[in-house]
Amino acid sequence: MDMDLNNRLTEDETLEQAYDIFLELAADNLDPADVLLFNLQFEERGGAELFDPSEDWQEHVDFDLNPDFFAEVVIGLADSEDGEINDIFARILLCREKDHKLCHILWRE
């Protein structure tokens, strides 16, 4: 895969894209009670956080997860408005290079 450092999504664009994908697919992949909980609580406690891909993605994909081009977005709820997300609904792996649309999602079980 040829990738260009100058053709990447910004961190904000990456978060926005991951959240849009989450909203589009959540109803088909989460328990209805979880979807309801997330929708009711997101305004107060919800969030999306951007990370370098964790090593456990290697169990799910068979390519190099260079953090210059791949990001992991964690979407869920925190105990408080400024707290860390500890109730995870989805972990989304995205390629940030604009010409390589790639997404993998690990949903809450």
UniProtKB/Swiss-Prot annotation:
Query: Which Pfam families does the annotation name?
Result: DUF440 (PF04269)
Q: Which InterPro entries match?
A: dsDNA_mimic_put, Put_dsDNA_mimic_sf
SUPFAM superfamilies, per database record: Putative dsDNA mimic
| Lineage top rank: taxon | Bacteria
Database matches in HAMAP family? Put_dsDNA_mimic
Return the similarity comment.
Belongs to the putative dsDNA mimic protein family.
NCBIfam families assigned: PRK05094.1
Function of the molecule: May act as a double-stranded DNA (dsDNA) mimic. Probably regulates the activity of a dsDNA-binding protein.
What name does this protein carry? Putative double-stranded DNA mimic protein YciU
- Which organism's genome codes for this protein? Escherichia fergusonii (strain ATCC 35469 / DSM 13698 / CCUG 18766 / IAM 14443 / JCM 21226 / LMG 7866 / NBRC 102419 / NCTC 12128 / CDC 0568-73)
